[in-house]
Amino acid sequence: MNNYDVMMMKSEDIYKLMKILTNIGWKSIRETSINRIIYISAVLYSFRNPDESNIFKEDYMFTITLSGPEDPDIENALVNLESNDVIAQSEEGYKVSDNASFSFKAKQDLRKTEWFEDIAYIVGIYGEDKIYDFIFRDPEYREALQGNSIYNLNIGEDNTTVKFLNSFKMAFEEKLYNKEDALDNRKYLELYFEYIFGKILRGEK
């Protein structure tokens, strides 16, 4: 894709993500939050869908910053959306404009929209702070930060965080009460994060 197509694709991603977050009660969202949620969406996609190519891998290029993962194109997409009156900016962050109308040129992958809905569900349950704490404990992110290096974070199948999450996957699935019941993405991630937050974020062994 050329630069214009990339901007339009990310503009649509951000707009749809913001609409989803608005529907679960968010009044506004900061640029750092958008970067973080899309980053964790990308990482968890490979964890949950190990046999599929990551739908974010070719589109997003995150670098390490002190405020979290950042894709510089996201800022351009926000400017594009704001200039077309699709979103509005305030001191609290960005929000979807009333009666926003915008004609997107990119071909949107419905899997991405559905995945954003699943991730927003998890963020809605556990809250921003806990999810963001998880990001800052993200092995891929911490390795880059501690190495004092600026480089593109790996969001594909070989991501260090995916390997970290997979190391707990077998033990987690053994604890599921109804192993024969197929869990949808939301329920699986909800139970998995409950397990991970207990084992990792509270320092339990």
Locate the predicted segments by residue:
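Domain-edge interaction signal
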Residues: 1-205
